[in-house]
Amino acid sequence: MKKLILFALLLSSFLGWSQDPIAYNYFDQALKKAATGNLKGSIDDYTKAIKIDPLFAEAYLNRALSKQKIGDIKGALTDVNTTISIDPKRGDAYTTRADINYKSKNYKGTIEDCTQSIVLNPKDYIAYNLRGLSYIHIEDKKNACADFSKAIQYGSQSAVKNKKMFCK
Protein backbone atom coordinates (compact mmCIF):
# COMPACT_ATOMS: atom_id res chain seq x y z
CA MET A 1 0.00 0.00 0.00
CA LYS A 2 2.89 2.38 0.77
CA LYS A 3 4.22 1.85 -2.74
CA LEU A 4 0.78 2.59 -4.15
CA ILE A 5 0.56 5.85 -2.19
CA LEU A 6 4.05 6.88 -3.31
CA PHE A 7 3.16 5.93 -6.85
CA ALA A 8 0.02 8.04 -6.75
CA LEU A 9 1.90 11.02 -5.38
CA LEU A 10 4.93 10.75 -7.65
CA LEU A 11 3.18 10.01 -10.92
CA SER A 12 0.31 12.43 -10.58
CA SER A 13 -0.47 14.54 -13.61
CA PHE A 14 -0.75 18.26 -13.48
CA LEU A 15 -4.17 18.26 -15.13
CA GLY A 16 -5.87 17.50 -11.83
CA TRP A 17 -3.95 20.10 -9.83
CA SER A 18 -5.82 23.06 -8.45
CA GLN A 19 -5.08 26.54 -9.68
CA ASP A 20 -6.58 28.00 -6.50
CA PRO A 21 -3.86 28.79 -3.93
CA ILE A 22 -6.21 28.33 -0.95
CA ALA A 23 -7.29 24.90 -2.21
CA TYR A 24 -3.66 24.00 -2.77
CA ASN A 25 -2.77 25.12 0.78
CA TYR A 26 -5.41 22.77 2.21
CA PHE A 27 -4.10 20.04 -0.08
CA ASP A 28 -0.55 20.61 1.16
CA GLN A 29 -1.72 20.47 4.80
CA ALA A 30 -3.56 17.24 4.02
CA LEU A 31 -0.42 15.69 2.54
CA LYS A 32 1.53 16.54 5.68
CA LYS A 33 -1.18 15.11 7.93
CA ALA A 34 -1.36 11.91 5.89
CA ALA A 35 2.42 11.55 6.06
CA THR A 36 2.31 11.70 9.86
CA GLY A 37 -0.57 9.21 10.10
CA ASN A 38 -3.32 11.74 10.81
CA LEU A 39 -5.61 10.28 8.16
CA LYS A 40 -8.86 11.75 9.46
CA GLY A 41 -7.24 15.19 9.55
CA SER A 42 -5.96 14.69 6.01
CA ILE A 43 -9.45 13.71 4.84
CA ASP A 44 -10.86 16.88 6.39
CA ASP A 45 -8.28 19.04 4.61
CA TYR A 46 -8.71 17.27 1.26
CA THR A 47 -12.46 17.88 1.66
CA LYS A 48 -11.84 21.60 2.25
CA ALA A 49 -9.67 21.76 -0.88
CA ILE A 50 -12.37 19.99 -2.90
CA LYS A 51 -15.07 22.37 -1.64
CA ILE A 52 -12.99 25.28 -2.96
CA ASP A 53 -12.10 23.52 -6.21
CA PRO A 54 -14.56 20.71 -7.08
CA LEU A 55 -12.40 19.66 -10.06
CA PHE A 56 -9.24 19.10 -7.99
CA ALA A 57 -8.65 15.51 -9.14
CA GLU A 58 -5.48 15.05 -7.12
CA ALA A 59 -7.31 15.91 -3.90
CA TYR A 60 -10.02 13.35 -4.66
CA LEU A 61 -7.41 10.68 -5.39
CA ASN A 62 -5.41 11.35 -2.25
CA ARG A 63 -8.57 11.49 -0.16
CA ALA A 64 -9.48 8.09 -1.63
CA LEU A 65 -6.13 6.72 -0.47
CA SER A 66 -6.65 8.07 3.04
CA LYS A 67 -10.20 6.73 3.17
CA GLN A 68 -8.97 3.33 2.00
CA LYS A 69 -6.40 3.25 4.80
CA ILE A 70 -9.05 3.89 7.47
CA GLY A 71 -11.33 1.25 5.97
CA ASP A 72 -13.87 3.51 4.26
CA ILE A 73 -13.85 1.44 1.08
CA LYS A 74 -17.14 2.81 -0.25
CA GLY A 75 -15.94 6.40 0.24
CA ALA A 76 -12.57 5.59 -1.32
CA LEU A 77 -14.24 4.05 -4.35
CA THR A 78 -16.51 7.08 -4.75
CA ASP A 79 -13.52 9.44 -4.63
CA VAL A 80 -11.42 7.45 -7.08
CA ASN A 81 -14.39 7.22 -9.47
CA THR A 82 -14.71 11.01 -9.25
CA THR A 83 -10.99 11.35 -9.98
CA ILE A 84 -11.40 9.23 -13.11
CA SER A 85 -14.45 11.20 -14.25
CA ILE A 86 -12.51 14.47 -13.88
CA ASP A 87 -9.30 13.14 -15.44
CA PRO A 88 -9.78 9.84 -17.28
CA LYS A 89 -6.14 9.75 -18.38
CA ARG A 90 -4.77 9.27 -14.85
CA GLY A 91 -3.25 5.81 -14.84
CA ASP A 92 -2.58 6.01 -11.11
CA ALA A 93 -6.30 6.46 -10.44
CA TYR A 94 -7.06 3.22 -12.27
CA THR A 95 -4.31 1.46 -10.30
CA THR A 96 -5.78 2.80 -7.06
CA ARG A 97 -9.25 1.60 -8.02
CA ALA A 98 -7.75 -1.75 -9.03
CA ASP A 99 -6.21 -2.06 -5.56
CA ILE A 100 -9.59 -1.33 -3.95
CA ASN A 101 -11.26 -3.88 -6.23
CA TYR A 102 -8.58 -6.47 -5.47
CA LYS A 103 -9.01 -6.08 -1.73
CA SER A 104 -12.77 -6.42 -2.27
CA LYS A 105 -12.13 -9.65 -4.23
CA ASN A 106 -13.49 -8.10 -7.42
CA TYR A 107 -10.81 -9.68 -9.61
CA LYS A 108 -12.54 -8.94 -12.92
CA GLY A 109 -12.73 -5.24 -12.00
CA THR A 110 -9.10 -5.32 -10.91
CA ILE A 111 -8.02 -6.79 -14.24
CA GLU A 112 -10.02 -4.18 -16.18
CA ASP A 113 -8.59 -1.27 -14.18
CA CYS A 114 -5.02 -2.58 -14.34
CA THR A 115 -5.38 -3.01 -18.09
CA GLN A 116 -6.55 0.60 -18.43
CA SER A 117 -3.69 1.79 -16.23
CA ILE A 118 -1.20 -0.10 -18.40
CA VAL A 119 -2.70 1.43 -21.56
CA LEU A 120 -2.07 4.87 -20.03
CA ASN A 121 1.31 3.97 -18.49
CA PRO A 122 2.87 0.88 -20.11
CA LYS A 123 5.60 0.70 -17.44
CA ASP A 124 3.23 0.57 -14.46
CA TYR A 125 4.74 -2.43 -12.68
CA ILE A 126 2.25 -2.14 -9.83
CA ALA A 127 -0.61 -2.65 -12.30
CA TYR A 128 1.14 -5.62 -13.93
CA ASN A 129 1.77 -7.26 -10.56
CA LEU A 130 -1.75 -6.62 -9.27
CA ARG A 131 -3.28 -7.88 -12.50
CA GLY A 132 -1.08 -10.97 -12.25
CA LEU A 133 -2.36 -11.65 -8.74
CA SER A 134 -5.92 -11.26 -9.99
CA TYR A 135 -5.26 -13.72 -12.79
CA ILE A 136 -4.03 -16.20 -10.17
CA HIS A 137 -7.35 -15.85 -8.34
CA ILE A 138 -9.32 -16.61 -11.49
CA GLU A 139 -6.95 -19.50 -12.27
CA ASP A 140 -5.34 -17.98 -15.37
CA LYS A 141 -1.73 -18.91 -14.62
CA LYS A 142 -0.42 -18.16 -18.13
CA ASN A 143 -1.50 -14.50 -18.06
CA ALA A 144 -0.48 -14.17 -14.40
CA CYS A 145 3.06 -15.33 -15.09
CA ALA A 146 3.32 -13.07 -18.15
CA ASP A 147 2.26 -10.10 -16.01
CA PHE A 148 4.69 -10.98 -13.23
CA SER A 149 7.48 -11.12 -15.84
CA LYS A 150 6.51 -7.68 -17.17
CA ALA A 151 6.36 -6.27 -13.64
CA ILE A 152 9.84 -7.64 -12.95
CA GLN A 153 11.10 -6.10 -16.19
CA TYR A 154 9.95 -2.70 -14.93
CA GLY A 155 11.42 -3.08 -11.44
CA SER A 156 8.89 -4.81 -9.17
CA GLN A 157 10.42 -6.79 -6.31
CA SER A 158 7.02 -8.11 -5.24
CA ALA A 159 6.56 -9.66 -8.67
CA VAL A 160 9.82 -11.59 -8.24
CA LYS A 161 8.35 -13.25 -5.14
CA ASN A 162 4.99 -13.79 -6.83
CA LYS A 163 6.57 -15.37 -9.89
CA LYS A 164 8.60 -17.75 -7.73
CA MET A 165 5.49 -18.70 -5.78
CA PHE A 166 2.94 -19.09 -8.57
CA CYS A 167 4.86 -19.78 -11.79
CA LYS A 168 6.64 -23.05 -11.11
How would you label these PLM feature ranges?
Residues 2-168:
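Alpha-helical tetratricopeptide repeat
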